[in-house]
Amino acid sequence: MRAVVRWSLCCAGLAGGLSPLTAQAWTRIGETQEVTLFVNRKSIERDDNIRRVWEMQDLKTPDAEGVRSRRYLNEYDCTYKMHRLGQMTSYAGPKLTGKKVAEVKEMGYWRKIPPNGVFVLTYIAVCVE
C-alpha cells in the first residue's frame, strides 16, 4: 500500500508540473555580482578522484543570448583541480523557468578551476574532506 501511495504522490508531482528547481534539492553555494550558484548535494557522485554534481546558475541579468539561468553537470578532478561542464540546458527565465534557449549534451574540455571564481566553491564542497 505504501508503495502505491508513494507512486501516486510521485506521479501527481510530475503531472502537476514540478519545475526542475522544485524537483531537485538546490543549495545556494555562492554568489557574485553577476550570478548565484546552486548545487544539488543529493546528486554528488564519486568515481575515484572525480566528482560529478548537478549545478544551477541563476544570472542577475540575461546574457547576450537571452539566457537567465542554466543547469548542467559539472565534473571535478579533485587531484588536478580541474573541471568540465556538460549536459547543459539554458533557460530564458530565472531558476530554470521560461523558454528553453539552448541545450548541449556533450561534456566540454577539462579546464583549470580559476582560484577566484564560483567553481572553486563547489570544488571545495565536493573535493576537500
Task: Label each residue range with its predicted role.
Residues 19-129:
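N-terminal secretory-pathway/extracellular module detecting exported/lumenal segments
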